[in-house]
Amino acid sequence: MTFKSGYLTVRETEIWNLRKLIPNQSEIARKLGISRQAVNFALISIEDKMERTFNETLDSNNLTPVTMNLVDGVMEAYSPAYQLPVIVSLSNINGLKVWYLYEGNCLRCNLERSCRRTLLDEADERGVDVADDERKMEPTKLALKVYSDDLKEKTILGS
């Protein structure tokens, strides 16, 4: 089951998208024509599902959590096996993605173009401006640019 098809219902996805733009539950409720309590209940369910998704990702990839931003769907983690920082993202356009932040051989990798396109789509969905010269950045650096704002609004785990 992937994030795209199985974790959030259509209504929950709609509420999650609005929450990124409108922090006030009452305003979200008015916009959707439902009660504030219904929005609150949905947000509790959304956060639970997203946290479970992140925890499953941590477990399946043997990662250690660092920070988690459930509003924007971004988690910072660490890979003890590869000794690398990792960004895990959830989005409508790309679903669940795991980005290992290493200085690799992106220019020689056959996935470089696909990674860059995915990151540029993420930037569009998240409203991140990417200048023309930045569009050609190595995917690792582009990932840091795309997710840097989301990682500032975070919950530090273990404190």
Q: Language-model segments: which ranges?
A:
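Short alpha-helical "recognition helix" segments of helix-turn-helix
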Residues: 26-35, 39
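Short alpha-helical "packing" element that flanks the helix-turn-helix/winged-helix DNA-binding module
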Residues: 11-19
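Non-catalytic terminal/accessory regions
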Residues: 130-159
